[in-house]
Regions:
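Bacterial N-terminal signal peptides that target proteins for export
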Residues: 1-9
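Short linear, low-complexity motifs centered on an aromatic residue
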Residues: 2, 21-24
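Bacterial N-terminal signal peptides
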Residues: 8-19
Length: 329
């Protein structure tokens, strides 16, 4: 009887050791950073990613999420931090990423994506994976594409219903050549600026406006410093979940696969949060006093069309990518 109990106990102990790290095993601690406020969808997705990784590894990997620019006020700092090994993972906009991988910048072309189903078909397919893989040249590992949504203009001067309304206004953009060129095509002055400076610059009238997805406009209560919101949807804003390449390759192969598959699964979770909240957030902004207008996107596309010719001339390898994206159903 004692022998039976002993064998049973040993089997139970062995099973528990397979799913729970040893008391003496070293837990691998990682940092995942963003620059956005804690309740933004980036961070909800990041926390879910961390939770699933911890659960799947039996607690052997513990990822802590640092929101709100705690590890770097600008997204470029986060990307550089991953290259240096000071930060393990980050969720950022593609704007700063384009400074590390020019192929990623193709996603920032104006009116490239028709709608959210088109986005999913492109970014979750071969085109998206190739763009993520290109980041390895910059010592970064692209895991998947979170999102921030389609970007829209806000300003404190007047409603923006047509391109001519932009003339003479100063707009903050990300440090991204495509964004800068696109805003200039509308006749506005484009001012590249890190996100941490934007609210104060709007408040003090250093700039007249900015452009961002509804989620950011809502999360940061830009209605307090901006009167007008034009739902232009001129750029789609993907947000790569990225890891330092050195940190990624230091993982054993099964954990590398786990990080990629978990990132892809959590991406659907994060995008759903953005999309489900968007309509309610627009209604909130109206209730908070913003003048919200829809626009004829076709006239904005026509005004920004020269941007395509300019950048395809500069980067000829973009042309087949643009065609593949536009042909994706």
């Amino acid at each position: 009887m004692k022998r039976t109990i002993s064998i049973g106990f040993c089997l139970l102990l062995s099973a528990s050791l397979m799913t729970t790290p040893s008391l003496h095993a070293k837990v691998m601690k990682m940092k995942l950073a963003t620059v956005v406020v804690p309740h933004h969808a980036y961070n909800e997705g990041a926390r879910e990613f961390a939770r699933r990784i911890k659960e799947a590894t039996g607690g052997a990997i513990d990822i802590r999420v640092f929101p709100g620019g705690q590890l770097g006020k600008g997204e470029r700092e986060l990307l550089e931090g991953m290259q240096m090994g000071a930060i393990d993972l980050a969720v950022t906009a593609t704007g700063p990423v384009s400074g590390f991988s020019q192929s990623m910048m193709v996603l920032d072309l104006p009116f490239l994506f028709r709608d959210y189903p088109h986005v999913d078909a492109v970014l979750d397919g071969p085109v998206g994976r190739k763009l993520l893989d290109d980041l390895e040249k910059a010592k970064l590992k692209g895991l998947s594409f979170f999102e921030n949504g389609f970007r829209n203009f806000t300003n404190s001067v007047r409603p923006l219903l047509k391109p001519e309304d932009f003339k003479g206004l100063k707009f903050r953009t990300m440090e991204n050549p495509v964004h800068l060129a696109s805003v200039r095509e509308l006749g506005a002055q484009a001012v590249p600026m890190s996100w941490g400076e934007v609210y104060t610059s709007l408040q003090t009238k250093v700039i007249d406006g900015q452009e961002n997805p509804v989620a950011i406009i809502h999360s940061y209560k830009l209605n307090e410093v901006q009167k007008y919101l034009s739902l232009t949807g001129h750029f789609y804003s993907p947000a790569p979940l990225t890891m330092g390449l050195r940190q990624f390759t230091s993982l054993k192969p099964e954990w590398q696969r786990l990080f990629i598959t978990t990132a892809v699964e959590v991406t659907a979770y994060e995008r759903k949060i953005i999309r489900d909240n968007e309509q309610k957030q627009v209604l909130d902004l109206k209730a908070w006093g913003m003048d919200v207008t829809n626009v004829d996107k076709a006239i904005f596309l026509k005004a920004m069309e020269p941007v395509y010719a300019k950048f395809i001339k500069q980067y000829p390898d973009w042309e087949p990518i643009v065609h593949r994206i536009r042909d994706t159903k």
